[in-house]
Amino acid sequence: MDNSIFYSLGNGIKFNKNKYKKEIGIFNGITSHELDKQTKTNNKVHFFKNTTPSTPVISKKDNIKQKKEEEEDNDNDNEESKEDDDFVEDDDNDDDDDDDDEDEENEEPKEKEFIKHQVNNDEEEEDITLFNKSNENENSDDSDDSDDSGKNKNKNKNKKVSKETQEDKHKREIATFRNKHRIKVDGTDIPDPMTEFSQLENRFKVRKYLLNNINEIGYKEPSPIQMQVIPILLKEREVVAIAPTGSGKTASFSIPILQALYEPKKEGFRSVIIAPTRELAQQIYRNFRLLSKGKPFRICVLSKNLHNQSTNENLIKNYDILITTPLRLVYLIKENLLSLNKVEYLVFDEADKLFDKNFQEQVDIVVTACQNPKLKICLFSATMNQQVEELGHSIMKNPIKIIIGEQNAAAITVDQKLIYVGKEEGKLLAVRQLIQKGLEPPILIFTQSKERAHDLFQELIFDGINVDVIHSERTQFQRDTIVKKFRMGKIWVLICTELMARGMDFKGVNFVINFDFPHTLASYIHRIGRTGRAGRPGVAYTLYTDADTPMLPTIVHAMKQSGSHVPDWMLNLKVQGKKKQQYRLKGVERESFSTIPLSERTSSKFKLRKNKKSFNLPGDQQKSNENNNNNNNNNNDNKKRKSFNNNGEKNNNPERKQKQIKKPKKII
């Protein structure tokens, strides 16, 4: 009997076959003596005789032939087994009686009938298997066709299973890669991240000049934000990206924009990048210049000179990329001096600041001015609250949200430390002690106001330190020269306000000192983010007094979240919600820390400008004209009053001083 009855148990299983072969041999009439000889040679045999795991498909004709051959073999085996049995019985029972021989002769035909009947049953059992269909066609050709169709179905199933397993495996690999780099994504149809810049050429067909510029700048491996944002923008999707300071957000949108614009065209602005400060706009401009080297893209930063030249339409059409602050752009839009109908990419850098209450109206004007149906809006920032996200989603189409690390968290590369100074007078002493310890410049010091920045400047300038101060009241020429000197190392310590807290990339800054405690968590994160950029380590010191306790728990939890050491008692501090809200809105009225007399504090070189120049928007022109007319009327009234003496008599020269010149006496 064939051993096909065991084929359904599984592939490649090894077992002791003696137990099963004895039972089969008994039914086939094989003696136990012959079975023992066979089992000595092969105690353990592979489950299948054939090495191939797949069983051949046999048609009905082949089955009939095999059955006939098996019947003949079984008959021969039965005859041989009978002869063996007779020979054994004769040897063993030589002393038996003749009656026993007669009984054996009578029993032989019965055994033959039993064996034949058993073989026929085995042949019937061989026709039935566990995997055969119950209903079979009568024609052998039909059965062969059905077998072929079954094979094809199994192959298709295997292919589907293999495809599904490959897709699942790919998804698992992408998920582990994102978890490794702390990339969190939210959206639909999210492209896979890239692992190397070399994939830009094969996967996205990025132009060679861009790849060469990336190598020349020194970008070896993409940062986590670049790994995910660049593929998304190259697939022409909108994005909301939240990543720590110094993580490479500018390059993540500069590379896809240059690839999408392809080449310079004289069609007007096709990409607009909006930044909250002019210093940040200048920095983005430099980044675009480095990446666009080799292609004559016309990139400009909106300035007063361009304001004056904006009436020339041909000049504006020559530009491809515009980088600006929102106020200047809104002025040109309201004056109908600028068209944004060709804009394909609108990027808001430091979006949480631009979507603040002070900028919301300006942002709405810019968005409504961009009428291109292919417009794609992108938001980038290190911090972003829920309100800003909702405003962003209201003007975007199915954006993808990306978070690197934890949302609204400080950079891991910055070692954050708190220093208690008691009162305001202790801050100046703490700064001098830190500098004496050997803090390596360049150093950034943040204050909450321009006046306090001036006072600190005048205190440190007499300590023999190359120090300077920058804020919004300085002229544009002064601000540009100060930033340039600070980058070149001519200025060691730069005192600044919130103007320099956002987006500025000073690669060599080793230390940041928060002279005044920040009012919000976002301000704290952006301040300390001026150090520890691009993977380099940095240190941030924050000075605090008793008046800063309402905001202290928030900063402490941010430090703990980013891995900095914080005492346990600070984590257990509890502050009333009203005090915290008042601190955020009103701040703290701080006492003066200066040791210089009040009359000698202000310097003529850094004197604050009283008449601040600003751009009058078209809607504000009537108010300004009315104010000017009122001022002119008041001046005329004053002139009329001065033209009369106290006695009511007219003065011939009212503008001169009313000193009467004595005429010389006539000599007779």
Swiss-Prot record:
GO BP field: maturation of SSU-rRNA
Coiled coil: none
EC number: 3.6.4.13
Acidic residues: bias regions: 70-108, 138-147
Keyword match Cytoplasm: no
Annotated Polar residues bias: 40-57
PROSITE patterns named among the record's database cross-references: DEAD_ATP_HELICASE, HELICASE_ATP_BIND_1, HELICASE_CTER, Q_MOTIF
Domain of life: Eukaryota
Chain ranges for the short sequence motif DEAD box as given in the UniProt record: 349-352
Notes on the domains: The Q motif is unique to and characteristic of the DEAD box family of RNA helicases and controls ATP binding and hydrolysis.
Function: ATP-binding RNA helicase which may be involved in the ribosome biogenesis.
Identification of the protein by name: Probable ATP-dependent RNA helicase ddx52
